[in-house]
Protein backbone atom coordinates (compact mmCIF):
# COMPACT_ATOMS: atom_id res chain seq x y z
CA UNK A 1 0.00 0.00 0.00
CA UNK A 2 1.32 3.48 -0.94
CA UNK A 3 2.35 5.72 1.90
CA UNK A 4 2.17 9.50 2.19
CA UNK A 5 5.79 9.84 1.10
CA UNK A 6 5.04 7.94 -2.12
CA UNK A 7 2.10 10.23 -2.87
CA UNK A 8 4.26 13.28 -2.26
CA UNK A 9 6.91 11.96 -4.61
CA UNK A 10 4.35 11.28 -7.34
CA UNK A 11 2.77 14.77 -6.98
CA UNK A 12 6.22 16.40 -6.72
CA UNK A 13 5.42 17.94 -3.35
CA UNK A 14 7.94 19.36 -0.94
CA UNK A 15 9.63 17.67 2.01
CA UNK A 16 7.95 16.70 5.30
CA UNK A 17 6.82 20.05 6.72
CA UNK A 18 3.76 20.72 8.87
CA UNK A 19 1.17 18.09 8.32
CA UNK A 20 3.46 16.25 5.99
CA UNK A 21 5.86 15.60 8.83
CA UNK A 22 3.20 13.60 10.62
CA UNK A 23 2.71 11.43 7.53
CA UNK A 24 -0.70 12.87 6.57
CA UNK A 25 -1.51 14.77 3.38
CA UNK A 26 -3.71 17.84 3.59
CA UNK A 27 -5.76 19.60 0.95
CA UNK A 28 -3.23 22.41 0.86
CA UNK A 29 -0.44 20.00 -0.03
CA UNK A 30 -2.37 18.57 -2.98
CA UNK A 31 -3.59 21.87 -4.43
CA UNK A 32 -0.45 23.95 -3.63
CA UNK A 33 -1.40 27.19 -5.40
CA UNK A 34 1.96 28.82 -4.63
CA UNK A 35 3.87 26.20 -6.59
CA UNK A 36 1.72 26.68 -9.68
CA UNK A 37 2.39 30.40 -9.59
CA UNK A 38 6.09 29.83 -9.31
CA UNK A 39 5.98 27.44 -12.29
CA UNK A 40 4.19 30.00 -14.42
CA UNK A 41 6.64 32.68 -13.49
CA UNK A 42 9.58 30.42 -14.25
CA UNK A 43 8.35 29.56 -17.77
CA UNK A 44 10.17 31.39 -20.53
CA UNK A 45 8.42 33.32 -23.22
CA UNK A 46 7.87 31.25 -26.39
CA UNK A 47 6.78 32.23 -29.88
CA UNK A 48 3.97 30.50 -31.67
CA UNK A 49 4.74 28.91 -35.01
CA UNK A 50 3.17 30.94 -37.85
CA UNK A 51 0.42 29.32 -39.85
CA UNK A 52 1.52 27.74 -43.10
CA UNK A 53 5.13 27.24 -41.98
CA UNK A 54 6.39 23.69 -41.65
CA UNK A 55 7.62 22.53 -38.29
CA UNK A 56 11.09 21.69 -39.63
CA UNK A 57 11.55 25.16 -41.11
CA UNK A 58 10.39 26.78 -37.89
CA UNK A 59 12.80 24.61 -35.91
CA UNK A 60 15.64 25.99 -38.02
CA UNK A 61 14.59 29.57 -37.34
CA UNK A 62 13.75 29.30 -33.65
CA UNK A 63 14.48 26.89 -30.85
CA UNK A 64 13.50 26.90 -27.19
CA UNK A 65 16.94 25.73 -26.27
CA UNK A 66 20.25 27.27 -27.15
CA UNK A 67 21.20 27.35 -30.80
CA UNK A 68 23.55 24.68 -32.07
CA UNK A 69 27.15 25.76 -32.64
CA UNK A 70 27.86 26.94 -36.20
CA UNK A 71 29.67 24.72 -38.66
CA UNK A 72 32.18 27.47 -39.47
CA UNK A 73 33.91 29.61 -36.86
CA UNK A 74 32.26 33.02 -36.66
CA UNK A 75 32.12 36.00 -34.33
CA UNK A 76 28.46 36.84 -33.66
CA UNK A 77 28.91 38.44 -30.27
CA UNK A 78 29.05 41.95 -31.71
CA UNK A 79 25.82 41.60 -33.72
CA UNK A 80 25.40 44.34 -36.31
CA UNK A 81 27.80 46.71 -34.60
CA UNK A 82 31.12 47.59 -36.15
CA UNK A 83 33.80 45.23 -34.94
CA UNK A 84 36.68 47.06 -33.35
CA UNK A 85 40.25 46.02 -33.85
CA UNK A 86 41.44 43.78 -31.04
CA UNK A 87 44.85 45.22 -30.40
CA UNK A 88 47.23 43.68 -27.93
CA UNK A 89 48.04 45.25 -24.65
CA UNK A 90 51.78 45.14 -25.29
CA UNK A 91 53.78 48.12 -26.45
CA UNK A 92 54.71 48.52 -30.10
CA UNK A 93 58.24 47.41 -30.88
CA UNK A 94 60.26 50.32 -32.26
CA UNK A 95 61.81 50.21 -35.72
CA UNK A 96 64.91 52.10 -36.74
CA UNK A 97 66.48 53.24 -40.02
CA UNK A 98 69.97 51.79 -39.75
CA UNK A 99 72.90 51.08 -42.10
CA UNK A 100 74.16 47.63 -43.10
CA UNK A 101 76.77 46.03 -45.34
CA UNK A 102 76.40 42.96 -47.52
CA UNK A 103 79.18 40.40 -46.81
CA UNK A 104 78.86 39.13 -50.40
CA UNK A 105 80.24 42.44 -51.70
CA UNK A 106 83.93 43.14 -51.48
CA UNK A 107 83.72 46.90 -52.20
CA UNK A 108 82.40 47.81 -48.73
CA UNK A 109 79.23 49.49 -50.05
CA UNK A 110 76.92 50.88 -47.34
CA UNK A 111 73.14 50.45 -47.56
CA UNK A 112 70.23 51.44 -45.28
CA UNK A 113 66.98 49.68 -44.35
CA UNK A 114 64.32 49.58 -41.65
CA UNK A 115 64.98 47.13 -38.85
CA UNK A 116 63.81 46.55 -35.30
CA UNK A 117 65.79 48.46 -32.74
CA UNK A 118 66.45 45.26 -30.78
CA UNK A 119 68.28 43.77 -33.80
CA UNK A 120 70.78 46.59 -34.11
CA UNK A 121 74.31 45.32 -34.57
CA UNK A 122 73.33 41.88 -35.88
CA UNK A 123 74.59 40.44 -39.16
CA UNK A 124 72.70 40.85 -42.40
CA UNK A 125 70.09 38.01 -42.39
CA UNK A 126 70.52 37.20 -46.10
CA UNK A 127 74.28 36.74 -45.80
CA UNK A 128 73.79 33.02 -45.19
CA UNK A 129 72.65 32.61 -48.80
CA UNK A 130 76.03 33.76 -50.08
CA UNK A 131 77.27 30.34 -51.16
CA UNK A 132 80.30 30.06 -53.40
CA UNK A 133 81.80 27.13 -55.30
CA UNK A 134 85.05 25.84 -53.88
CA UNK A 135 87.45 25.95 -56.82
CA UNK A 136 90.75 24.17 -56.05
CA UNK A 137 93.98 26.14 -55.95
CA UNK A 138 97.25 24.65 -57.17
CA UNK A 139 100.83 25.72 -56.69
CA UNK A 140 103.57 26.19 -59.27
CA UNK A 141 105.24 22.96 -58.23
CA UNK A 142 101.99 20.94 -58.49
CA UNK A 143 101.34 22.36 -61.93
CA UNK A 144 104.76 21.40 -63.22
CA UNK A 145 104.61 17.89 -61.72
CA UNK A 146 101.00 16.80 -62.35
CA UNK A 147 99.01 19.37 -64.36
CA UNK A 148 101.30 20.19 -67.27
CA UNK A 149 99.70 19.76 -70.71
CA UNK A 150 101.19 20.59 -74.10
CA UNK A 151 97.85 21.86 -75.42
CA UNK A 152 97.37 24.26 -72.48
CA UNK A 153 99.74 26.89 -71.14
CA UNK A 154 100.06 27.93 -67.52
CA UNK A 155 98.59 31.38 -68.20
CA UNK A 156 95.58 29.92 -70.02
CA UNK A 157 94.91 27.46 -67.18
CA UNK A 158 95.13 30.28 -64.63
CA UNK A 159 92.71 32.34 -66.71
CA UNK A 160 90.25 29.41 -66.82
CA UNK A 161 90.31 28.90 -63.05
CA UNK A 162 89.98 32.64 -62.42
CA UNK A 163 86.81 32.76 -64.53
CA UNK A 164 85.52 29.62 -62.77
CA UNK A 165 85.78 31.39 -59.40
CA UNK A 166 84.19 34.59 -60.68
CA UNK A 167 81.19 32.93 -62.37
CA UNK A 168 80.68 29.89 -60.08
CA UNK A 169 81.38 27.25 -62.75
CA UNK A 170 78.74 28.58 -65.13
CA UNK A 171 80.64 27.34 -68.16
CA UNK A 172 78.40 29.02 -70.71
CA UNK A 173 79.22 32.39 -69.12
CA UNK A 174 82.86 31.38 -68.78
CA UNK A 175 82.98 30.56 -72.50
CA UNK A 176 81.41 33.93 -73.30
CA UNK A 177 83.93 35.85 -71.13
CA UNK A 178 86.91 33.78 -72.25
CA UNK A 179 89.74 35.77 -73.81
CA UNK A 180 89.78 34.22 -77.28
CA UNK A 181 92.09 36.91 -78.66
CA UNK A 182 94.96 36.23 -76.29
CA UNK A 183 94.44 32.48 -76.02
CA UNK A 184 93.39 29.72 -78.37
CA UNK A 185 89.72 29.43 -79.21
CA UNK A 186 88.13 26.78 -77.04
CA UNK A 187 84.68 25.19 -76.91
CA UNK A 188 82.60 24.70 -73.79
CA UNK A 189 83.48 21.00 -73.78
CA UNK A 190 87.22 21.81 -73.95
CA UNK A 191 86.94 24.14 -70.96
CA UNK A 192 84.98 21.58 -68.94
CA UNK A 193 87.37 18.78 -69.84
CA UNK A 194 90.44 20.77 -68.75
CA UNK A 195 88.85 21.94 -65.51
CA UNK A 196 87.60 18.51 -64.37
CA UNK A 197 90.84 16.83 -65.44
CA UNK A 198 92.81 19.14 -63.12
CA UNK A 199 90.29 18.60 -60.28
CA UNK A 200 90.63 14.82 -60.61
CA UNK A 201 94.45 15.02 -60.65
CA UNK A 202 94.56 17.22 -57.54
CA UNK A 203 92.09 14.94 -55.73
CA UNK A 204 94.27 11.90 -56.43
CA UNK A 205 97.46 13.65 -55.37
CA UNK A 206 96.06 15.18 -52.17
CA UNK A 207 94.01 12.15 -51.11
CA UNK A 208 94.71 10.59 -47.73
CA UNK A 209 95.36 6.84 -47.95
CA UNK A 210 92.38 4.76 -46.84
CA UNK A 211 89.68 7.32 -47.70
CA UNK A 212 86.99 7.08 -50.37
CA UNK A 213 87.61 9.49 -53.21
CA UNK A 214 84.84 11.34 -55.03
CA UNK A 215 86.59 12.14 -58.27
CA UNK A 216 84.60 14.31 -60.73
CA UNK A 217 84.41 12.75 -64.19
CA UNK A 218 83.47 14.51 -67.41
CA UNK A 219 83.14 12.66 -70.73
CA UNK A 220 83.79 15.30 -73.37
CA UNK A 221 83.27 12.91 -76.29
CA UNK A 222 79.85 11.89 -75.04
CA UNK A 223 78.85 15.52 -74.56
CA UNK A 224 79.95 16.42 -78.10
CA UNK A 225 78.00 13.50 -79.59
CA UNK A 226 74.93 14.45 -77.56
CA UNK A 227 74.98 18.03 -78.81
CA UNK A 228 75.57 16.86 -82.37
CA UNK A 229 72.58 14.53 -82.21
CA UNK A 230 70.40 17.28 -80.76
CA UNK A 231 71.50 19.63 -83.52
CA UNK A 232 70.64 17.06 -86.17
CA UNK A 233 67.29 16.45 -84.54
CA UNK A 234 66.56 20.17 -84.49
CA UNK A 235 67.61 20.70 -88.13
CA UNK A 236 65.32 18.01 -89.57
CA UNK A 237 63.21 18.97 -92.56
CA UNK A 238 59.41 18.52 -92.54
CA UNK A 239 59.81 15.62 -95.00
CA UNK A 240 62.17 13.83 -92.63
CA UNK A 241 59.80 14.37 -89.70
CA UNK A 242 56.89 12.96 -91.71
CA UNK A 243 58.97 9.96 -92.81
CA UNK A 244 59.98 9.26 -89.21
CA UNK A 245 56.36 9.40 -88.05
CA UNK A 246 55.40 7.04 -90.87
CA UNK A 247 58.12 4.58 -89.87
CA UNK A 248 56.98 4.69 -86.24
CA UNK A 249 53.41 3.96 -87.30
CA UNK A 250 54.57 1.03 -89.41
CA UNK A 251 56.62 -0.26 -86.49
CA UNK A 252 53.54 -0.17 -84.24
CA UNK A 253 51.54 -2.03 -86.89
CA UNK A 254 54.22 -4.70 -87.21
CA UNK A 255 54.36 -5.14 -83.43
CA UNK A 256 50.56 -5.40 -83.25
CA UNK A 257 50.56 -8.03 -86.02
CA UNK A 258 53.31 -9.93 -84.25
CA UNK A 259 51.32 -10.02 -81.01
CA UNK A 260 48.20 -11.11 -82.88
CA UNK A 261 50.13 -13.85 -84.66
CA UNK A 262 51.64 -15.11 -81.40
CA UNK A 263 48.21 -15.17 -79.81
CA UNK A 264 46.80 -17.12 -82.76
CA UNK A 265 49.63 -19.62 -82.60
CA UNK A 266 49.00 -20.13 -78.88
CA UNK A 267 45.29 -20.68 -79.53
CA UNK A 268 46.13 -23.15 -82.29
CA UNK A 269 48.48 -25.03 -79.99
CA UNK A 270 45.75 -25.20 -77.35
CA UNK A 271 43.32 -26.60 -79.92
CA UNK A 272 45.79 -29.27 -81.04
CA UNK A 273 46.58 -30.21 -77.44
CA UNK A 274 42.88 -30.36 -76.59
CA UNK A 275 42.19 -32.60 -79.59
CA UNK A 276 45.01 -34.99 -78.64
CA UNK A 277 43.91 -35.07 -75.00
CA UNK A 278 40.28 -35.78 -75.90
CA UNK A 279 41.24 -38.61 -78.25
CA UNK A 280 43.55 -40.16 -75.64
CA UNK A 281 40.85 -40.00 -72.96
CA UNK A 282 38.34 -41.75 -75.18
CA UNK A 283 40.78 -44.52 -76.03
CA UNK A 284 41.36 -45.06 -72.33
CA UNK A 285 37.62 -45.12 -71.62
CA UNK A 286 37.04 -47.73 -74.31
CA UNK A 287 39.80 -50.00 -73.01
CA UNK A 288 38.66 -49.75 -69.38
CA UNK A 289 36.16 -52.49 -68.36
CA UNK A 290 32.68 -51.16 -67.71
CA UNK A 291 31.08 -52.27 -64.45
CA UNK A 292 27.41 -52.12 -63.83
CA UNK A 293 26.68 -49.88 -60.89
CA UNK A 294 23.45 -49.51 -58.96
CA UNK A 295 20.94 -46.94 -60.13
CA UNK A 296 21.64 -44.60 -57.20
CA UNK A 297 25.41 -44.44 -57.75
CA UNK A 298 24.98 -44.00 -61.50
CA UNK A 299 22.89 -40.92 -60.88
CA UNK A 300 25.61 -39.46 -58.65
CA UNK A 301 28.23 -39.21 -61.44
CA UNK A 302 28.60 -35.87 -63.20
CA UNK A 303 25.92 -35.29 -65.79
CA UNK A 304 28.24 -33.98 -68.49
CA UNK A 305 32.02 -34.52 -68.52
CA UNK A 306 34.32 -31.62 -69.30
CA UNK A 307 35.02 -31.57 -73.01
CA UNK A 308 37.60 -29.69 -75.02
CA UNK A 309 35.38 -27.88 -77.53
CA UNK A 310 32.38 -26.78 -75.46
CA UNK A 311 32.03 -26.58 -71.72
CA UNK A 312 28.42 -27.43 -70.99
CA UNK A 313 26.77 -26.22 -67.78
CA UNK A 314 26.73 -28.56 -64.80
CA UNK A 315 23.43 -28.92 -62.94
CA UNK A 316 24.85 -30.96 -60.08
CA UNK A 317 23.58 -28.68 -57.29
CA UNK A 318 20.75 -26.92 -59.11
CA UNK A 319 17.94 -29.06 -57.78
CA UNK A 320 15.45 -30.78 -60.06
CA UNK A 321 16.22 -30.09 -63.73
CA UNK A 322 15.20 -31.47 -67.09
CA UNK A 323 17.68 -33.67 -68.87
CA UNK A 324 17.09 -31.72 -72.09
CA UNK A 325 18.62 -28.63 -70.47
CA UNK A 326 21.98 -30.41 -70.45
CA UNK A 327 21.99 -30.30 -74.24
CA UNK A 328 21.53 -26.53 -74.30
CA UNK A 329 24.57 -24.76 -75.72
CA UNK A 330 26.22 -22.22 -73.40
CA UNK A 331 26.19 -18.52 -74.20
CA UNK A 332 29.96 -18.53 -74.80
CA UNK A 333 29.40 -20.22 -78.19
CA UNK A 334 28.83 -17.55 -80.82
CA UNK A 335 26.02 -17.50 -83.35
CA UNK A 336 28.44 -18.18 -86.19
CA UNK A 337 29.65 -21.38 -84.53
CA UNK A 338 26.10 -22.43 -83.71
CA UNK A 339 25.03 -22.09 -87.36
CA UNK A 340 28.12 -23.97 -88.56
CA UNK A 341 27.45 -26.68 -85.96
CA UNK A 342 23.85 -27.10 -87.08
CA UNK A 343 24.97 -27.33 -90.72
CA UNK A 344 27.52 -30.04 -89.86
CA UNK A 345 24.92 -32.00 -87.89
CA UNK A 346 22.51 -31.86 -90.83
CA UNK A 347 25.26 -33.08 -93.16
CA UNK A 348 25.90 -36.02 -90.81
CA UNK A 349 22.17 -36.78 -90.62
CA UNK A 350 21.92 -36.19 -86.86
CA UNK A 351 18.83 -34.65 -85.33
CA UNK A 352 19.25 -31.23 -83.78
CA UNK A 353 17.14 -32.21 -80.74
CA UNK A 354 17.36 -35.96 -80.09
CA UNK A 355 15.54 -37.80 -77.32
CA UNK A 356 17.28 -36.72 -74.11
CA UNK A 357 18.17 -40.04 -72.55
CA UNK A 358 21.21 -40.26 -70.27
CA UNK A 359 23.41 -41.96 -72.85
CA UNK A 360 22.19 -39.84 -75.77
CA UNK A 361 22.79 -36.58 -73.89
CA UNK A 362 26.34 -37.61 -73.07
CA UNK A 363 27.18 -38.75 -76.61
CA UNK A 364 25.40 -35.82 -78.30
CA UNK A 365 27.34 -33.29 -76.23
CA UNK A 366 30.60 -35.07 -77.01
CA UNK A 367 29.78 -35.05 -80.73
CA UNK A 368 29.01 -31.34 -80.79
CA UNK A 369 32.15 -30.59 -78.81
CA UNK A 370 34.24 -32.52 -81.34
CA UNK A 371 32.52 -30.75 -84.22
CA UNK A 372 33.26 -27.34 -82.72
CA UNK A 373 36.88 -28.37 -82.22
CA UNK A 374 37.04 -29.55 -85.84
CA UNK A 375 35.53 -26.25 -87.01
CA UNK A 376 38.14 -24.23 -85.09
CA UNK A 377 40.98 -26.38 -86.43
CA UNK A 378 39.71 -25.89 -90.00
CA UNK A 379 39.59 -22.15 -89.47
CA UNK A 380 43.14 -22.11 -88.10
CA UNK A 381 44.35 -24.22 -91.01
CA UNK A 382 42.69 -21.89 -93.54
CA UNK A 383 44.28 -18.87 -91.88
CA UNK A 384 47.71 -20.49 -91.98
CA UNK A 385 47.31 -21.38 -95.66
CA UNK A 386 46.20 -17.83 -96.47
CA UNK A 387 49.18 -16.41 -94.60
CA UNK A 388 51.57 -18.78 -96.36
CA UNK A 389 50.17 -17.88 -99.77
CA UNK A 390 50.34 -14.16 -99.05
CA UNK A 391 53.95 -14.39 -97.85
CA UNK A 392 54.85 -16.39 -100.96
CA UNK A 393 53.37 -13.70 -103.23
CA UNK A 394 55.15 -10.98 -101.28
CA UNK A 395 58.46 -12.83 -101.52
CA UNK A 396 58.05 -13.21 -105.28
CA UNK A 397 57.21 -9.51 -105.65
CA UNK A 398 60.24 -8.45 -103.64
CA UNK A 399 62.47 -10.84 -105.57
CA UNK A 400 61.27 -9.36 -108.89
CA UNK A 401 61.91 -5.83 -107.60
CA UNK A 402 65.42 -6.74 -106.43
CA UNK A 403 64.80 -5.63 -102.85
CA UNK A 404 66.13 -8.88 -101.36
CA UNK A 405 69.70 -8.16 -102.50
CA UNK A 406 69.77 -10.16 -105.74
CA UNK A 407 69.35 -8.90 -109.30
CA UNK A 408 65.86 -7.99 -110.39
CA UNK A 409 64.20 -10.93 -112.16
CA UNK A 410 61.61 -10.46 -114.89
CA UNK A 411 58.03 -11.22 -114.04
CA UNK A 412 56.76 -14.65 -115.04
CA UNK A 413 53.22 -13.50 -115.78
CA UNK A 414 51.82 -13.37 -119.33
CA UNK A 415 51.77 -10.21 -121.40
CA UNK A 416 54.37 -8.05 -123.09
CA UNK A 417 54.71 -5.71 -120.14
CA UNK A 418 55.63 -8.53 -117.78
CA UNK A 419 58.35 -9.89 -120.08
CA UNK A 420 60.40 -6.68 -119.97
CA UNK A 421 62.70 -6.14 -117.00
CA UNK A 422 61.91 -3.35 -114.64
CA UNK A 423 63.70 -0.16 -115.73
CA UNK A 424 63.99 2.76 -113.35
CA UNK A 425 65.00 6.22 -114.38
CA UNK A 426 67.91 7.83 -112.53
CA UNK A 427 66.72 9.87 -109.57
CA UNK A 428 63.29 8.21 -109.63
CA UNK A 429 63.87 5.21 -107.40
CA UNK A 430 61.13 3.31 -105.61
CA UNK A 431 59.36 5.06 -102.78
CA UNK A 432 60.93 4.00 -99.46
CA UNK A 433 57.44 3.60 -98.08
CA UNK A 434 56.68 0.95 -100.71
CA UNK A 435 59.91 -1.02 -100.14
CA UNK A 436 59.49 -1.58 -96.41
CA UNK A 437 59.60 -5.29 -95.67
CA UNK A 438 57.06 -6.53 -93.15
CA UNK A 439 58.79 -9.58 -91.70
CA UNK A 440 55.86 -10.46 -89.48
CA UNK A 441 53.01 -10.56 -91.93
CA UNK A 442 49.65 -8.94 -92.37
CA UNK A 443 46.47 -9.85 -90.48
CA UNK A 444 45.08 -13.23 -91.49
CA UNK A 445 41.74 -12.03 -92.78
CA UNK A 446 40.51 -11.81 -96.38
CA UNK A 447 39.22 -8.28 -95.74
CA UNK A 448 42.75 -6.98 -95.17
CA UNK A 449 43.80 -8.43 -98.53
CA UNK A 450 40.93 -6.62 -100.26
CA UNK A 451 41.88 -3.37 -98.55
CA UNK A 452 45.52 -3.73 -99.67
CA UNK A 453 44.46 -4.45 -103.27
CA UNK A 454 42.15 -1.43 -103.34
CA UNK A 455 44.89 0.78 -101.86
CA UNK A 456 47.45 -0.38 -104.44
CA UNK A 457 45.00 0.17 -107.31
CA UNK A 458 44.20 3.69 -106.10
CA UNK A 459 47.92 4.54 -105.82
CA UNK A 460 48.54 3.27 -109.38
CA UNK A 461 45.68 5.43 -110.68
CA UNK A 462 47.17 8.49 -108.96
CA UNK A 463 50.59 7.80 -110.54
CA UNK A 464 48.97 7.43 -113.96
CA UNK A 465 47.21 10.81 -113.60
CA UNK A 466 50.52 12.63 -112.92
CA UNK A 467 51.97 14.30 -116.09
Curated annotation (Swiss-Prot):
Keywords: Activator, Chromatin regulator, Coiled coil, Cytoplasm, Growth regulation, Isopeptide bond, Nucleus, Phosphoprotein, Repressor, Transcription, Transcription regulation, Ubl conjugation. GO terms for cellular component: cytoplasm; cytosol; NuA4 histone acetyltransferase complex; nucleoplasm; nucleosome; nucleus; replication fork; Swr1 complex. The modification Phosphoserine is found at residue 448. It is found in: Nucleus; Cytoplasm. Residues 1-48, 258-305, 404-467 are annotated as: Disordered. GO terms for molecular function: RNA polymerase II-specific DNA-binding transcription factor binding; transcription corepressor activity. Involved in transcription repression and activation. Its interaction with HDAC2 may provide a mechanism for histone deacetylation in heterochromatin following replication of DNA at late firing origins. Can also repress transcription independently of histone deacetylase activity. May specifically potentiate DAXX-mediated repression of glucocorticoid receptor-dependent transcription. Component of the NuA4 histone acetyltransferase (HAT) complex which is involved in transcriptional activation of select genes principally by acetylation of nucleosomal histones H4 and H2A. This is DNA methyltransferase 1-associated protein 1. It comes from Homo sapiens. The lineage of its organism: Eukaryota, Metazoa, Chordata, Craniata, Vertebrata. The gene is DMAP1.
Amino acid sequence: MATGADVRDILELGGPEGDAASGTISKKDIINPDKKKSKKSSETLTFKRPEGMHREVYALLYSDKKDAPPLLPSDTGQGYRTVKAKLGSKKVRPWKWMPFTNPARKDGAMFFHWRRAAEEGKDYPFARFNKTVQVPVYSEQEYQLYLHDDAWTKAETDHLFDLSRRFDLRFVVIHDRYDHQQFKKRSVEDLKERYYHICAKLANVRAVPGTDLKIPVFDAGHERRRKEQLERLYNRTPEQVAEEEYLLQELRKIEARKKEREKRSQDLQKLITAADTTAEQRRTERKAPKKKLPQKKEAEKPAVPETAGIKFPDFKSAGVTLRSQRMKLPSSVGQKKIKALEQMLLELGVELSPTPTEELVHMFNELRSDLVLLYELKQACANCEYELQMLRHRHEALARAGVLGGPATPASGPGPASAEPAVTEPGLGPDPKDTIIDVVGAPLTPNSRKRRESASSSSSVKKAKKP
